[in-house]
Amino acid sequence: MLAKRIIPCLDVRDGQVVKGVQFRNHEIIGDIVPLAKRYADEGADELVFYDITASSDGRVVDKSWVSRVAEVIDIPFCVAGGIKSLEDAAQILSFGADKISINSPALADPTLITRLADRFGVQCIVVGIDTWFDAETGKYHVNQYTGDETRTRVTQWETLDWVEEVQKRGAGEIVLNMMNQDGVRNGYDLQQLAKVRAVCHVPLIASGGAGTMEHFLEAFRDANVDGALAASVFHKQIINIGELKAYLAAQGVEIRVC
């Protein structure tokens, strides 16, 4: 069995790490490189960097910090933000990123997933899905351009359908960003994760809602996700990664202990 992964997420805007609640009202957390190094030193398995306004601004992720991050950490990292071409992806990978993640650009042009997978291999290609639960209809809908709350829009895709579509097109991994839970630290949406897990045959990463060590355990044990991504609990030092991993290992979760 592959070890479960603990993945700090760093949302980047204007060259700094920020964090919001339900993708709104972002506060500045700090500089990118020192935070990346801190998480690597604490025992993170991987890092994810989202340039959150790149797609809504119509630009590609700012690459100036990618090589600086690669110089100070020795764990895999993934970069996302406005990647719309093979050239964009090649540049980011050449600067030292191990994976690239696409979200809004994949919704705009689903063939991008296949072209990237064919060129760089499925192991490099992550698709991020920003999913919102509509309590009135009981359905999960995919959102686009979520980095800017004034431009966020609901797409025609229901989440489970899009999960199946991106796999057919070559996604090697899926990060499910559960917008209702984002930043509120009440736990991952286990019901939604279970529904997605049933149709997801590539590695699935849970994102949105971690507030306690138990929340990570629930995601691994009850929803059988491959990795758990979190931001505010790590940024605000509510949870230490080394202590989290020791706790999970004690609960019988297969994990790479620091």
Curated annotation (Swiss-Prot):
Keywords: Amino-acid biosynthesis, Cytoplasm, Histidine biosynthesis, Lyase. One of its GO terms (biological process) is L-histidine biosynthetic process. Pathway: Amino-acid biosynthesis; L-histidine biosynthesis; L-histidine from 5-phospho-alpha-D-ribose 1-diphosphate: step 5/9. The active site is at D11, D130. It catalyses: 5-[(5-phospho-1-deoxy-D-ribulos-1-ylimino)methylamino]-1-(5-phospho-beta-D-ribosyl)imidazole-4-carboxamide + L-glutamine = D-erythro-1-(imidazol-4-yl)glycerol 3-phosphate + 5-amino-1-(5-phospho-beta-D-ribosyl)imidazole-4-carboxamide + L-glutamate + H(+). It is found in: Cytoplasm. One of its GO terms (cellular component) is cytoplasm. Its EC number is 4.3.2.10. Its main location: cytoplasm. It is an enzyme of class 4 (lyase). InterPro entries: Aldolase_TIM (IPR013785), His_biosynth (IPR006062), HisF (IPR004651), IGPS_HisA/HisF (IPR050064), RibuloseP-bd_barrel (IPR011060). The keyword Amino-acid biosynthesis applies. The keyword Oxidoreductase does not apply. Disulfide bonds: none annotated. GO terms for molecular function: imidazoleglycerol-phosphate synthase activity; lyase activity. Heterodimer of HisH and HisF. IGPS catalyzes the conversion of PRFAR and glutamine to IGP, AICAR and glutamate. The HisF subunit catalyzes the cyclization activity that produces IGP and AICAR from PRFAR using the ammonia provided by the HisH subunit. Belongs to the HisA/HisF family. This is Imidazole glycerol phosphate synthase subunit HisF. The gene is hisF.
